[in-house]
UniProtKB/Swiss-Prot annotation:
The keyword tRNA processing applies. PANTHER family: 3-DEOXY-D-MANNO-OCTULOSONIC-ACID TRANSFERASE/TRNA GUANINE-N 7 - -METHYLTRANSFERASE (PTHR23417), PENTACOTRIPEPTIDE-REPEAT REGION OF PRORP DOMAIN-CONTAINING PROTEIN (PTHR23417:SF14). The active site is at D159. Residues 165-170 are annotated as: Interaction with RNA. GO terms for molecular function: tRNA (guanine(46)-N7)-methyltransferase activity. It comes from the Bacteria. Belongs to the class I-like SAM-binding methyltransferase superfamily. TrmB family. Pfam families: Methyltransf_4. This is tRNA (guanine-N(7)-)-methyltransferase. S-adenosyl-L-methionine binds at E84, E109, D136, D159. Residues 1-29 are annotated as: Disordered. One of its GO terms (cellular component) is tRNA methyltransferase complex. It comes from Acidovorax sp. (strain JS42). Its EC number is 2.1.1.33.
Length: 251
């Protein structure tokens, strides 16, 4: 994903760290205050993506503001609200929104080609239950979402930060998980997925340690029916790579 720009986006090579971005954060800065939910990536916005940004952005992209979001007004209806942090190029996001039309999906991603790609899918597939915030999800969580506002959270394939000295930059850390849990309604869920086993192990440890959350499985969960296998994921599986899903619910 993704915002933490995920391994769902293999077309976006890493750019040198930018001032203030996650890549330049000191290793000892506490998460999440010193670490954003994303890494800036290089990538060119295509003509089709730019057209979608221009034509559909005004309807589906929300402005960030440090004030609580009125989700009913933003979506034009009252429905269960799911937050997605980092959606890469939007392949899985669009699929899930189509198979779950009863839910609203608030999706955070800072990568402009990814935002344009999802908007293009929205137009082509006639999807109406997605709204996008092109902003750091940590700030969205802190300032725009009230406790108990969410029915679900999706974090699929966040940047694994493979090197041990970079592990503190990973998105799934206790302070962020505590914030997510507090913003879930009782019975709401957090669904994470990763294709990097050491990160899966960290996710399991951190999520299991949060007192407001309960694991729906003994360890890793079966892949829920709504989450599709993306082209990137299918390619990885053909190469023998594993994928780990974790689903925890709010007590």
């Amino acid at each position: 994903m993704t915002q933490t720009l995920s391994s769902q986006d293999p077309q976006a090579p890493a750019a040198p760290p930018m001032p203030g971005a996650a890549g330049s954060a000191p290793a000892d800065v506490a998460h999440p205050k010193g670490i954003k939910s994303y890494v800036r990536r290089a990538g060119r916005t295509t003509t089709g993506q730019a057209k979608a940004l221009e034509e559909l952005g005004p309807r589906y992209v929300l402005d960030y503001a440090p004030a609580l979001l009125d989700a009913t007004a933003a979506f034009g209806r009252s429905a269960p609200l799911v937050l997605e942090i980092g959606f890469g190029m939007g392949e899985a996001t669009a699929h899930i929104a189509r198979v779950r039309p009863q839910d609203n999906f608030l999706c955070c991603e800072v990568h402009e080609p990814g935002v344009g790609a999802l908007l293009k899918r929205i137009g082509e597939q006639d999807i109406h239950n997605i709204r996008i915030l092109q902003h750091d999800a940590v700030e969205v969580l802190e300032h725009m979402l009230a406790p108990g506002a969410l029915d679900g959270v999706h974090i699929f394939f966040p940047d694994p930060w493979h090197k041990k000295r970079h592990n503190k930059r990973r998105l799934i850390q206790p302070p962020l998980v505590a914030q997510l849990a507090a913003r879930l309604k009782p019975g709401g869920y957090i669904h994470c997925a990763t294709d990097w086993q050491p990160y899966a192990e960290q996710m399991l440890e951190v999520l299991s340690a949060e007192p407001l959350l309960s694991n729906t499985a003994e360890g890793y969960a079966p892949q829920p029916d709504y989450r599709p296998l993306t082209k990137f994921e299918n390619r990885g599986m053909r190469l023998g790579h594993g994928v780990w899903d974790l689903v925890f619910t709010r007590r």
